[in-house]
Amino acid sequence: MSPLLPTHWGASAPQNEPTLPSPSHSVSTRVGDEEKLRRSEGSDGEDRINLDSNKYDVKGMKETEDGGANKQVMVVFEQKSGKELEKPIEEGPFTQPRWRHSLPFVKPKHPPPPPPLSLDDAPVTPEVSANFFNLLFFNWISPMMALGSARPLQDADLWRMDAARGAKPLSEKLLASYAARTKKANEYNARLADPNTPLPFSRRILYSVLPHREQREKDYRKKHGKKHASLAMSLLDVFGWFFMSAGFIKVFGDTCQAVTPLVIRRLINWSANYQAAKSAGLDLPSRGPGIGAAIGLLLLLICSSLGMHHYFIRSMGTGVLSRAAIISAVYQQALQFTQKSRGQIPNGKLVNHISTDTSRIDFAAGFSHMLWTAPVQMIVIIIILIVQIGYSALPGIAFLLVMTPLQARFMKTLFMFRKKAATWTDKRAKLLQEILGGMRIVKYMAWEKPFLERIHAIRSMELKYIRLLLIFRSGMTAIAMSLPILAAILSFITYSLTSHSLEAAKIFTVITLFNLMRMPLMMWPMTLSSTADALNALGRLEAVFDAELVKEEKKVDPSMDVAIRLENASFTWDSAPIEEDNMMSKLTGKYAKVLNGGKPGGPPGKKEKKNKPKKVTAAEEIQAETAAGQPGAGEASAEGQGQKNPSAPGIDEEISEKKEVEIFQLRDINLNIPKGSLTAIVGAIGSGKSSLLQGLMGEMRRTTGSVTFSGSTSLCAQTPWIQNATVRENILFGQPWDEERYWAAIRDSSLEADLELLEDGDGTEIGEKGINLSGGQKQRVNIARAIYYNADIIALDDPLSALDAGVGKAIFFNAIINALSGKTRVLVTHALHLLPYVDNIIMMEDGKIGEVGTYRELKERNGAFAKLIKEFGNEELAEEKMETEEEAVESSGPTVTHDRANMMSKGSAHTLMQTEERNVGALKKGTFFDYLKAGKGVFMLPLLFFCIVVAQSFYVITSFWLVWWEETKWPQPNGFYMGIYAGLGVGLAIALFFQGFSNALINYFASVNIHHNAISRVMLAPQTFFDTTPLGRIMNRFSKDTDTIDNTLSDAMRMAISTLANIVGSVILLAIIEPYFLIAMAVVSLLYLHNAMFYRRSSREFKRIDSILRSSLYSHFSESLSGVATIRSYGETARFFEDNIHRVDIENRAYYLTIVNQRWLGLRLDFLGSLLSFSVAIIVVCSSSVSASNGGLGLSTIVSVQQAFSWLVRQIAEVENDMVGAERIMHYANELEQESPHQIEGTKPPASWPSEGTIEFKDVRMRYRPELPDVLKGLTLNVGASEKIGVVGRTGAGKSSIMVALFRMSELSHGFIKIDGVDVSKVGLNDLRSGISIIPQDPLLFSGTLRSNIDPFNTKTDAELYDTLRRSHLIGSSDSSHNSDSQNRFNLDTVIEEEGGNLSVGERSLVSLARALVRNTKVLVLDEATASVDLETDAKIQETIRQEFRDRTLLCIAHRLKTILAYDRILVMSDGQVAEFDTPENLFLSGGIFTEMCSKANISLADIKAAAALRF
């Protein structure tokens, strides 16, 4: 081994320890004047550091090779000139922080060293090489804590886990164990199903005496007797000995603790004998035995503490590693999900599994051994009690035993509440995942507030069970705290009634024993609760482990004479059942009303009363989870979807008949695709073109036959999957850098002009889902990736449809024909005019191959293909013309020569995705105040304080009452003392309940208000927030952080407050007994405070780093799962799995150190607490003024609370750590930037606004973010009522920015926009966006039904909605409702999957058109709405626009000149300004840019005049 850091840092790493890839990390620190670096030329010619030279920046540290096997740690300095220098760390002006430097009078001479340059350079944890002493006392983490005390820790500072505890080997073991257990269970179930296999002996005996034996045996074989693999047992297989040994260590610690009362008895007996001898004037006994007993007490307490903390490090360590193994295994499983599994377990649920469920398993692992050690500890204490006071202890013990079933009943109820709460948590997470992922369309449609109401409704149901959980936990805690006192009361009363006299030694030994029961009694219910939560979570996770996976890898045969061979292959899409949840029916009152979306648009007529608009129930709205669909197969959407359709006015009754779900299938596919050929797949909508491609790629279930490839594959999907990474990283996609191949791919995919426009060229960061790229740019990046990947076989799923026709033509010839020549290309396309250039054509008909051949062969056959060509012959010519038109539009400027330097990263761009906010140091000022304010602290804190004072008063008086009873302070009978003692105990129990209840209410109100405010502000945040913040980060706030404030923070605060109250009460009691105790308390308190402050500086940074790394993990998890089809088609599953493993391991560095430094602190604070107990024992031995009774009371009190001192510090730290999560979500709740008001009452426009549709832009300037340049630069134009305006211009000219400005997605920096004379900046955003409509370029749908997507808040009748479906061509225009419904795949209850995954792009565009028809506004914007659809869909959309929007004002941002020639005026944009604006005729005659466009597109004045005759 060679040290990566100096030995005094305590870190060394084996040379063969593998390093993990990670992003670069650097931190700069300015060195002071005394550490200036000097460089001078040495005699040996080597450069030396010169301390007299200019200042340098310390960039970080790295490990370098020094002559072979030896390694050396170098500090990297950067000179002002940019030159980097390296220097061994031993020679640097740094002082490695140590514990002593945290003392106020010991300061290091130099600053601490900087962090390593990257995560790769972090050393392996020194735990693996630490000696026994350092492991025993956790000294190995001290250097890290000292560094954290000296400066804020960075992620690169944190040690790597050793390879054996990496996520990869652990997840592999877990999956292997679960698979083995599943196999064993299946074998047992198979044997059990055989009637010849005898049932287990116990069942045979039981059923022989019960009626209906045969039926019982049958049920047992089919259902009750079946076994199922257990994930909990699989985890035990992986962590068996390490985890189980923790329990035995705890038993050792508990045994030491249970013996302490016997030592206390010896001390009290010695004190009583000493006092008696002193009173009688006899020789005083030697103090030696007393001091010896005090030392014995100290040693027992230290051993007990060591046992407890080493128990926790093993059990909690198991939790950390279990979480890592489960997350990695879940990710690996999810990457292999079949379509059916993805439908049953959507991404939102998976994110909830890895955030909430794994956290509950992790938490439970730390305490689960208490399920059996607590009863063992109780039994040992009970035996000692019986030995001490005989059978008088039995009533108290019996009371405890009677109360145990009550606790178990409470736990069962808690388990039920937790399960119900988790169900609603899943629903909330799923809804949030979809809404936040589609916020752009939500804002365009002004749906923020209605969706907010849905979220609040679900949250209210979730909080209903959380509230009950908090109340029950308060009750259980009060019972657990009170049980020892009430049991002691019963035992003492019995002891007194049986004619025994109370003796100090017996009293306080028994009290100490009963007090020792408090912790197991208090922890056991919590352990039961957490175990119940964990078992529930494990049960939910088992669905992931049991999910159906893609069973086989692609079959590759390089020797095959063809590229792809399909033999008798049939494929089918899976149908995922709609999730049913009876709990949804329990939404009543306002929640049901909210989820129903309010009242319908208008009351039905008298004849329509029986046919009222269907009110969408909560179950239908929220439960519309993935169902009966075929993601990825646009044409193959489910027909009917099996939903019952309500009858409606004007709709034939037969529409409402329930229809069977029709699953799309490809049948009997036999196909050979030659190597190096270009094969096109064509066919009508719904024929199975994309399905065939998905079947080839393994995304569609193959039911029969075989598919064989001759080489590697890649997929260019119709909807491109773009990662949150740079343009270059998206194109490379994990492949090695090859400069020439890379720039060739850029050129062939027509990305050169785009890279020059981007601020940082190919180093520009792309947001999630390619948010800052246009649809065409995303598709070109997608194509460039396929070209660069250099696979043998490339599947292209209609990639040209998203491109301008001119660009599409260029890419077809430059990329598909030329650059990929020699590769096997399979192209799905609707561009019929390109077919003469392909080698082979496959004609799909109704899920079968209709014809195969060359273009000429198929035309000559006069079959289906010839019919298709004949039917769309004119449109084929039109398509070629469109290409010329669009090429003219895009090339309407000077010819540009592309400079590679302009396309490369310059390293100076603004980062799109904002770095996650991280406060350094203590919690942000006001965090606790804001939390308490949210928790209604003004009212609740006084109530809580009052309950604490009352409870502690009862505690102190109850403790002293025993002393007074033993001393017979008042001449009263025993009944007097017994009655008051019992009353005090009951009063204490009641006070403790109200104390816990008050605390629970504060946490409940805080949870309600923080989440409400946070999601409200997020929903009303500007669009730039969603463009620059990863969805995974936002979801982390509303999953893990919300779970923290709902549950973890509540428990931590309750424990901290109750512990603090107990300590205060105990200190008051001890001060009354012996005031000198306060001196020892003051000294120890200073040491407590110093250790706590030393701990907190590193603890909070561990937590914050962990939170940030966890968000990164969740973001990667969500992002990669959304692109699983692309990942699998490229064969990159292993790389993404390794990336996820790396992220889990990186996060575990911070998380594991958080656990260890808690143990470091706990052990030291327990030692200080043991010293306090020792000091009380010495006071009892050495002080003559302390009576035996008071000494016994003091000893029993300090022993029972000595661990409470360390527990308090840990709980306060835990509260602070958990408050980090609250701080993060409160940042959203209080500080998140907001859009302009959505409602402005004083300037609310009339309900009919806009009624005319006039639009005026005056000197409009706009930028997307403050740090970016203007994209609109003084735009001025006027649009008349019902005028149709076509907008054209090159990419980046500002076309779409007009729409952004009109909808106020970004606010203007200058000028104004008026609609019907109303300045849009003066009206609320909701009024503005509700008054105008949009058909966006990328139509986004939400999971649910077709009804919920076009009329999500139930404002229209069924008749109106069916009429809309006809007008938007989603169903036929036949007069017969029955025919139109039965002959089309759509009805109002057709299930729509997440993001409309089971519809084609064209079908999604038609749904978007239907939305616009339902909204029926005076102003409509089409943002390149037909750019990504086929000719047939384009024709339908244009026909609907012409017929339905005659009297509407229309702004059409167009690619194709043909689509806007019939418009009233044409707006030509250039560089954010109006270049030309007039009628098509006048612009053509003006000889400007538009004339040039028309000339290049071969459009004549006659064409324009002909189009003018067709104007709206």
UniProtKB/Swiss-Prot annotation:
GO biological process, one term: biological process involved in interaction with host
Residues that span the membrane, as ranges: 229-249, 288-308, 363-385, 475-495, 507-527, 937-957, 974-994, 1067-1087, 1167-1187
Biased composition (Polar residues): 13-29
Binding site for ATP: 683-690, 1289-1296
Biased composition (Low complexity): 619-643
Record-level GO cellular component terms: extracellular region; extracellular vesicle; membrane
Protein EC: 7.2.2.-
Pfam families, A to Z: ABC_membrane, ABC_tran
Domain spans labelled ABC transmembrane type-1: 246-533, 943-1217
Gene3D superfamilies the record matches: ABC transporter type 1, transmembrane domain, P-loop containing nucleotide triphosphate hydrolases
Keyword terms, alphabetized: ATP-binding, Membrane, Nucleotide-binding, Secreted, Translocase, Transmembrane, Transmembrane helix, Transport, Virulence
Comp. bias (Basic and acidic residues): 31-65
Subcellular localization, as worded in the UniProt entry: Extracellular vesicle membrane; Secreted
Positions of region (Disordered): 1-68, 594-656
Disruption phenotype: Abnormal extracellular vesicle size. Decreases the rate of non-lytic exocytosis in macrophages. Decreases melanin secretion. Decreases virulence in a wax moth model of infection.
Role: Transmembrane transporter. May play a role in the packaging or formation of extracellular vesicles (EVs), and in the export of virulence factors from EVs. Required for efficient non-lytic exocytosis from host macrophages, the process by which the yeast escapes host macrophages with both host cell and pathogen remaining viable.
Protein's UniProt name: ATP-dependent permease YOR1
Source organism of the structure: Cryptococcus neoformans var. grubii serotype A (strain H99 / ATCC 208821 / CBS 10515 / FGSC 9487) (Filobasidiella neoformans var. grubii)
Gene: YOR1
